[in-house]
Amino acid sequence: GSAGPQVCGVSTFSGKSGVQIPSGSSDFRRQDGGGRGRGIIAGGITPSNQDIMDSIEIATLGDSTDFGDLTYGRAIKDVGCSSATRALFGGGYIVGTGDSNAIDFVIISSGGNAFDFGNLNVATLRDGGKVCNSTRGIWASGQIIPSTSPGTTNIIQFVTMATTGDASDFGDLTKDRRDAYGVQSSTRGVFAGQETKNPTSAAVNILDF
């Protein structure tokens, strides 16, 4: 009828207590009722360019299984980010061609080939770092090939995870660098442990999503 959802097994409420009805898309929940637990490994060079994506279930031990293919083969180094529903892979290195600006995405809960999301706004970017939350994916730093002086970049760029489209400019790191590995909370990203042209850098940069 038109009475709306019914909760079975609840007969009375004591005082001001009650139950919290689940809300939001069921895409945010695993089919078995557990927590989010899938990892996806993509791309590589062996020595040719690889488009393979494998997946693992983090809660259990075992070999990876085939998930699907990237839009084209390339080496991807620490340039993946994810929300609860999507995984994005941005940039990478193509043997014989150079760096890639492509962004691919997949739906984590289902296997299948990657879809085109858009492009990074720096066409020759690799060895960059990334941070992400449920809303934004952010890439920062990178090595420019061919390695013109200084061969690294300080650019920060972002995408909105739930949409598709090219990356937009977010801002700049405090200096040019590559390998700016990132960690994040739901509200803040931190980049540290970077390498400049010479020598390595101990600088730590923070940003708010």
Predicted region positions:
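Polar, enzyme-active/binding microenvironments
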Residues: G1-F209
